Amino acid sequence: MTFSERWVSAWNAHDVDSVLEHFHEDVVFTSPVAAMLMPESAGVVRGKPALRDYWSRALQRFLNLRFVVEAVYQGIDTIVIVYRNQDDGLVSEVLRFTGDLVIEGHGTYLVP
């Protein structure tokens, strides 16, 4: 199973612990949704515990959360997972790795 398959499977199961298994303790993650759910973060989430808090809040807010992967792009130490969310919105998750773990991530959303 590829990283993106494990990633989407964990998200669709609403299993934050399984998603977090692939993230470094010192991860930095940015997202406009984080800015909305955690205004004090200004959209920048630092560290695995804070990321757990953000994603737990997101799952409480979006009870019907579901992702369908449309495409995956791979670079040297980066992948981009393009997917549709539960609202049929197009999203790209840009994930940079150190070794086997994500050290930096960015949730980006299609601008209408």
Language-model features, listed with the residues they occupy:
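A beta-strand edge to alpha-helix "cap/lid" segment located at domain peripheries
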Residues: 58-112
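A solvent-exposed, acidic/Ser-Thr-rich amphipathic alpha-helical stretch
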Residues: 18, 24-70
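Hydrophobic pocket/interface hotspot
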Residues: 7, 19, 27, 47, ...
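Short acidic-aromatic low-complexity motifs
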Residues: 1-28
